[in-house]
Amino acid sequence: MNEEETNFVGIADLPNQRHKIVSRNGVAFTLMLCGESGLGKTTFCNTLFSTTIKSHMGPEKVRAKHAEKTVEIEITKAELEEKNFHLRLTVIDTPGFGDFINNSGCWESVVEFIEDQHESYMRQDQQPDRRKIIDMRIHACLYFLRPVRNGVRPMDLEAMKHISKRVNLIPVIAKADMYTRRDLALYKTRISQVLEYHQVNVYKPNMDEGDPVFHRQIQGIINCMPFAIVGSEDDIRTPDGRVVKGREYPWGIVEIENEEHCDFKQLRNILIRSCMLDLIQTTEEKLYEQYRQEQMKVRQYGEPKLRTIDNAKFKEEEENLRKRFTEQVRVEETRFRQWEQRLIAERDSLNKDLEAQHVQIKQIELEIERLKAATSSRKR
């Protein structure tokens, strides 16, 4: 036994121990897909994990969802295994989000669901027996954007503002194969500028300054944001004989994993290969802790969550809204009374004119009668 082995304590084996524990227990990961229908959320999810996680909705079901005019929460669970490592995956979809003419407040049910998962975990964590905690806290939210001229639709911007306060938000440009490289570059710049100007919290991976290779990799991922993605579950044979996931068009083939065609690989890296544990850790140590502290400041131990309608701020806003409504009603009533008085005055004026005309007509009739009587007298 040499001197190095004699002085070896074993601290350096701690990462190996951690690796064994994680490998044995696996990891639970919850992903939310948010955005209007028709942007390829289901296709992307199945492409991301190289298996069918979610089934596509048929035309009848899509029409039924549109008729309901409500945002729903759909939960899909799956157990994935790769090289003896288990991933307990939960996918949260939001059918109906942003699909209606009036989409004001459509994000409220999504934010409420995210907060409910923090609330559920916090209440379970306060129980004596915490061995069977059900953790549904959402680790990442992919927000699918349809590019517009000014970068982001007002509804999407407002939704991302609220959602980003509770979850790791990752905006993506859906169906990138519909745009030219020039258009995509322009959309990316505009979207980034809008999000930065309005202070929307977009997830940024932690940079490891001590690992130059990993640092460059993460910097490359950040430079690609917002990710322009293409999804496909079909295998396509390229002219050079390769079989790839992609889409075939008359002008050529779009390869999903070709970085010159889209940012799918970079998005997969941030979600799975490079930053999944960072997403989980950020959720647990930052976002959940922030929610827990906020609730502890306004609640006693064991007290149920303050509902929106019981919130003092909400009541104040409700009272202000009631006052504004009352004032508006008063103004409208005053305006109506003034309008009514003008109508009455006009009616009275018209009635007076009408009476005067009746008097004139009577006088004319009497004059005619006198003239007739005078004419008859002369004839006699």
Swiss-Prot record:
Q: Where in the cell is it found?
A: Cytoplasm, Cell cortex
**Keyword match Ribonucleoprotein:** no
| Region annotation G3 motif: where it falls in the sequence | 93-96
Record-level Gene Ontology MF annotations:
GTP binding; GTPase activity; molecular adaptor activity
Biological process (GO) annotations held by this record are:
cytoskeleton-dependent cytokinesis; mitotic cytokinesis; protein localization
Q: Which PROSITE patterns does this chain map to?
A: G_SEPTIN
List keywords of the entry alphabetically. Answer: Cell cycle, Cell division, Cytoplasm, GTP-binding, Mitosis, Nucleotide-binding
Segments carrying the region annotation (G4 motif) are 174-177
Q: Identify the main location.
A: cytoplasm
User: Would you say which domain of life the source belongs to?
Assistant: Eukaryota
Where would I find the Septin-type G domain in this sequence? 25-298
Give residues annotated as binding GTP: 35-42, 70, 96, 175-183, 231, 247
Q: Which CDD domains match?
A: CDC_Septin
Q: Name one GO cellular component term.
A: mitotic septin complex
Q: Which Pfam families match?
A: Septin
**What InterPro entries would the database entry show?**
G_SEPTIN_dom, P-loop_NTPase, Septin
Annotated spans, G1 motif: 35-42
The family classification in the record reads: Belongs to the TRAFAC class TrmE-Era-EngA-EngB-Septin-like GTPase superfamily. Septin GTPase family.
Functionally, this protein is described as follows: Plays a role in the cell cycle. Involved in a late stage of septum formation leading to the separation of the daughter cells.
Tell me how this protein assembles: Component of the septin complex composed of two copies of each spn1, spn2, spn3 and spn4.
User: Which protein, by its recorded name, is this?
Assistant: Septin homolog spn4
Biological classification of the source: Eukaryota, Fungi, Dikarya, Ascomycota, Taphrinomycotina
Name the encoding gene, please.
spn4
